[in-house]
């Protein structure tokens, strides 16, 4: 059966044809559960749970003292302390450590969404850009305001069955509110039906 013929069948609204697998995939997948999502947000914001999570899943982040300061349906804020655990030989924060905090600010919300739906979400960074504006000293805070855009990308993949790539922005600021670094992370999302 051709794709054109398939589009004329009565079940066209509940099935689409994958361009890579040539097999029917259901479009009526269960959306992200907001109750579970709020619970995941609370868990990641809990200092004890987050420290345990990083110790087990991201030990470098645990050692560096990465912290989740805010996570909701609009934005995510992470921070890292200054000091010997995060510094470079010039006594400022090492650029790769900044990248860790900036990346988590863009990825924490999609990670929570992946745990709030029955389908499997494959997500990974496929590209990044950074601009270093000022020497990073002391506690640096990273803010991403793209949580709604992340949800839209995941829901688009859920609906189409195709991978979706999106750029998310993270801004690093020092304790005086001055920008020290600007980051762009290109995320790739693919929702896979478990059935």
Task: Describe each region flagged by the PLM.
Residues 109-148:
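Hydrophobic beta-strand-centered segment that forms part of the acyl-chain substrate-binding groove
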Residues 62, 124-126, 140, 164-168:
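Hydrophobic core residues within well-ordered beta-strands of beta-rich domains
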Residues 62-68, 126-132, 153-155:
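Short structured motifs
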Residues 85-107, 120:
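Hot-dog-fold acyl-thioester-processing enzymes
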Residues 46-55, 60-61, 151-153:
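Short Pro/Gly-enriched beta-strand edge/turn motifs at strand-loop
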